[in-house]
């Protein structure tokens, strides 16, 4: 990066150490490398790339004190740090399982938001990701699929926000403690190896004692989203609303 912009590094990466500390606590697996650096490159075409222990980022993420209340690199920083576990320590075997890298990084960056900014901000982030998913409601391709002609096609809403939402639903279904235990086991058992989605499924089923085939079939291996029917009834006597939601 230009020497003239080096003073912006402290603003841009003010959260990096806190992110590393939080992920070690939340994931339960120590940071797996000897060091961690951020390097900003001029004319870098992507937002960031999670090279093991050395993330490369665009200089567009740099900012000064004058704009610190208008912008933040926290989300990108947390996303790339999360990849040190999900993408570097353990990585997808082929592009069809990219969500195992990007979905986890997307979700864990939101978990860091919850840690530092609270649950309402976390929910706001989830809502924003959901809007990104439903903006592609005509899409008929599942998260895991091999019908792509170029790997770049896999870097889509399916791997990022939809993958993150699948993890959030699974965490909500199983509870935070069990989810955390499953993720820790997944990383420890497959560290320095490549994985497919079934490797993740097997660990969640083993530790939960439940079959999750319906969950993963519906949300990962099949496309679209569920259609629901909502029934609304007002009880004048009790002044209460009876609301029922059923999947069609």
Regions found by a protein language model. Give the residues of each.
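Hydrophobic alpha-helical and helix-loop surface patches within well-folded domains
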Residues: 1-246
């Amino acid at each position: 990066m230009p020497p003239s912009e080096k003073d912006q590094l402290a603003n841009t990466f003010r959260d990096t150490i806190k992110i590393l500390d939080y992920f070690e606590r939340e994931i339960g697996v120590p940071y797996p490398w000897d060091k961690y650096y951020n390097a900003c490159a001029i004319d870098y075409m992507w937002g960031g790339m999670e090279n093991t222990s050395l993330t490369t980022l665009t200089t567009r993420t740099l900012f000064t004190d004058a704009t610190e209340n208008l912008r933040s690199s926290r989300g990108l920083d947390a996303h790339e740090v999360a990849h040190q576990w999900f993408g570097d320590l353990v990585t997808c075997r082929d592009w069809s399982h990219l969500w195992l890298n990007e979905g986890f990084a997307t979700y864990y960056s939101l978990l860091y938001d919850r840690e530092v900014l609270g649950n309402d901000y976390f929910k706001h982030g989830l809502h924003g990701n959901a809007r990104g998913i439903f903006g592609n409601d005509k899409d008929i391709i599942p998260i895991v699929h091999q019908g792509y002609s170029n790997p770049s096609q896999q870097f889509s809403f399916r791997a990022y926000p939809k993958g993150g939402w699948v993890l959030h639903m699974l965490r909500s279904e199983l509870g935070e403690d069990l989810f955390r235990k499953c993720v820790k086991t997944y990383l420890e058992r497959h560290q320095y190896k490549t994985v497919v989605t079934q490797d993740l499924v097997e660990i969640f089923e083993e530790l939960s004692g439940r079959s999750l085939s319906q969950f993963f079939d519906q949300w990962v291996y099949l496309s679209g989203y569920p259609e629901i029917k909502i029934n609304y009834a007002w009880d004048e006597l009790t002044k209460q609303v009876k609301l029922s939601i059923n999947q069609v």
